[in-house]
Curated annotation (Swiss-Prot):
Belongs to the RxLR effector family. Residues 199-216 have a biased composition (Low complexity). Keywords: Host cytoplasm, Host nucleus, Secreted, Signal, Virulence. This is Secreted RxLR effector protein 28. It comes from Plasmopara viticola. It comes from the Eukaryota. The gene is RxLR28. The lineage of its organism: Eukaryota, Sar, Stramenopiles, Oomycota, Peronosporales.
Length: 243
C-alpha cells in the first residue's frame, strides 16, 4: 500500500517537472501537450479527413454500387433499375394520348362556314361583320362632305365638345370689337391706314352688345358655318362670325 503511494507520487512529480503545468492544474489532472504532439494531432486529423474523402470518391464496391450514388438516387446506367420503367415511343409524358390516324377519322371535317373551337371560318361567300363604307356612309357618327360643301353647326352645339362660355370672362381679343353678338368689327390697321368694318374710337375694347351682352369670349352658339358658296372674312384668331 505504501509502495503504490510512493510510485504515484514519483509519477506525479515526474509529470510536473516534464511539463509546464502548474501545481494546481496537475492536481486536477490537466496536462499540456508539447508542440510535437500538437503537430502530430493535426496531421492525424488531416489524414482522417482525406481518408473519408477518398472513401466517398472510391470506385464502385459493395458499399457504393455503380448505379447508386451516395445521395441514394439511382443513376441511369446500362441497366435501368426496375423502379423506373421505360416510356414507350408513342406515349407522351403528359399522359394525353397522341393523335393518330384513327383519332383523326373519328372527328368529322368541319364545314366551310362552321365553327372550329368557337372561331368562325371565313370563306369567300361569307359576309363580314364590318359594313362596307359608301360615299356618304356614316363612320362613328360623322358625315362625309364634298369639296364645295360645308357642314352647318347647330345653334347651340359646342365645337369640339367644349362647353358654352358664359359669364364675365376676361377679354383676349385686344383691339377688336363685336356688336350685336354676330357682327365682327376691327380697329384701324395702323400700317395701311384702312378701316375694316365700322370705325372704332377710343382704346381697344372687346365687348358684346345686344342680346348677348357679355364681356370676353363670345359664346359658341354665335358660331355658324358659312353659307354654301360664300367666302367670309376671317379673323386673325381663327374665329368666324356671321349675321
Amino acid at each position: 500500500m505504501h509502495v503504490s503511494r510512493i510510485i504515484a507520487h514519483i509519477a506525479l512529480a515526474t509529470a510536473i517537472t516534464a511539463t509546464t503545468v502548474s501545481p494546481t492544474d496537475a492536481a486536477w489532472g490537466w496536462t499540456v501537450k508539447s508542440t510535437d504532439e500538437v503537430k502530430a494531432d493535426k496531421r492525424d486529423l488531416v489524414a482522417s479527413r482525406g481518408l473519408r474523402g477518398l472513401i466517398g470518391q472510391a470506385s464502385p464496391n459493395e458499399v457504393s454500387p455503380a448505379n447508386v450514388p451516395v445521395s441514394g438516387i439511382p443513376l441511369l446506367g446500362d441497366k435501368q433499375p426496375s423502379g423506373y420503367p421505360m416510356l414507350p415511343a408513342d406515349s407522351p409524358s403528359t399522359g394525353s394520348s397522341l393523335l393518330n390516324d384513327d383519332l383523326l377519322q373519328e372527328n368529322p371535317v368541319p364545314p366551310a362556314n362552321g365553327l372550329v373551337h368557337g372561331v368562325p371560318l371565313l370563306s369567300s361567300n361569307q359576309p363580314l361583320q364590318t359594313p362596307m363604307l359608301s360615299g356618304n356612309g356614316p363612320i362613328t357618327g360623322y358625315r362625309f362632305f364634298s369639296g364645295n360643301e360645308s357642314p352647318m353647326l347647330p345653334a347651340n352645339s359646342p365645337i369640339t365638345g367644349l362647353p358654352l362660355l358664359s359669364g364675365n370672362i376676361p377679354s383676349t381679343f385686344e383691339g377688336e370689337q363685336i356688336s350685336n353678338g354676330d357682327e365682327y368689327q376691327q380697329n384701324v390697321d395702323e400700317d395701311k391706314g384702312q378701316n375694316f368694318g365700322h370705325s372704332v374710337s377710343g382704346p381697344p375694347t372687346t365687348t358684346l352688345t345686344g342680346p348677348h351682352t357679355k364681356s370676353g369670349i363670345p359664346p359658341f352658339e354665335n358660331l355658324v358655318a358659312p353659307a354654301k358658296g360664300s367666302m367670309p372674312n376671317t379673323r386673325r384668331n381663327g374665329y368666324q362670325f356671321f349675321e
